[in-house]
Amino acid sequence: MQPRIVVGTPPQSSPHVPVAIVGAGACGLVAAITLRDAGIDCVLLERDARPSGSTALSSGFIPAPSTAVQKRAGVEDSPEQFARDIQAKAHHTAAPHLVKAYSEAIGPAMDALQAQHAIEFIVLEGFLYPGHSVRRMHAVPEKTGAALVVQLERAALAAGADVLCDAQVTELWVDNQQRITGVGYVRPDDSIDHLRCDALLLACNGFGGNAAMVAELLPDMKHALFAGHTGNDGSAIAWGQALDARTADLQGYQGHGSWATPQGALISWALMMEGGVQLNANGQRFHDETQGYSEAAVHVLAQPGGVAWSVFDGEILKLARTFPDFCEAEAAGAVKTCADMNVLAALIGCNAIYSGAHCALIHWFTALNDGQKRTFFGSESYSDARAFKRQLTAPFYAIKVTGALFHTQGGLDIDAQCRVLRDDETAFPNLLAAGGAARGVSGNAVWGYLSGNGLLSAVAGGAIAAKTIIELLKEKL
């Protein structure tokens, strides 16, 4: 059933709740926890049989500055430094008001989850993700998005939030003053139930699962594998457009250039940041891997067959095995062992004439850090200023990967309080959006994505939206 707007108020016989939240991923769950901490009742409406969403499919890593756990790790950081990193990655095209709001809100939100709700966080050690100037990536000890969702759901339920699963919201009810009066949602038997509310938060993510919208707005990803949650159907944007709400950054998205194929598993970009390289079917490097895994998706898809090989050595393998997603991919047969360059060339399928020379590029590039243009045996040259810490040493390990679309970074335009904006820049009285349903802080292109921006927007946005709703309810809307 298509998302639609219904003018009026749901039947008076329908249950009433102060706050309804569409989506029980990280954004919705954090908002619910924050609302319950303030004593406000809320209901999360989740389309799936249990909370999951894009968060559960992610690595679950959340960037945050100046948290208690980061300080204990001896890392000096600040919201201002984090904001500078965000804008540098986005070439200063990210929405300034959201960069400031999120970089300031995420640390306190993470500390509250740990101190008040017993969600343990660690700071990842040993490497930096592209664009981050210090170690600020937080994770639950399991280092998976699924484990993060489990902890957030536990905390939300313990705080007294209600989570209604198998409830796909298809209707937003609105009065003549554009005030949200309730929602309609489809149950497993195709019946439609209604819920009246005083405020509504859209935490239902983006449009990556909507093939038509992807083809229109993200043509580079038209034929890419979608590795996100299928519930990302663009409902929030459809509702917003029907209400004449503004949208922003709809060409922004997070891709990933290291999706193991055919296993269908995410391979951490930490392997590239620690000295790994990507080679195409001709044995050629074709981009600077340290620029970011999001834009790497486009580079990989542009290679012969739309695939590449992520190549690394034993020292990097040790780091890789600290990530559960990698271990699952390895168990599924994604990791190939190559005793020397000739075996690696045979695996990749390089032309026999060039195989040894091409694979020698692994050593050549790790030895040269001069930033000069280099020619790949007749291919176009490009400037590569990547500085390697050391040379890769045999045996080599290789994983066949493709580029994938993970989630979109554009959506409904919002102010710093996560209130949805109309075309005239005024805010709807009681409609809020955050996380993937709203514009993020990655600007309007794939290269603007700083690692962790998705969960930054979800967690910080969820906390901010909840606090905005708390103030709205105090004012009786």
Which ranges hold each PLM region?
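A glycine-rich dinucleotide-binding beta-alpha-beta segment and adjacent secondary-structure elements
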Residues: 171, 357-441, 445
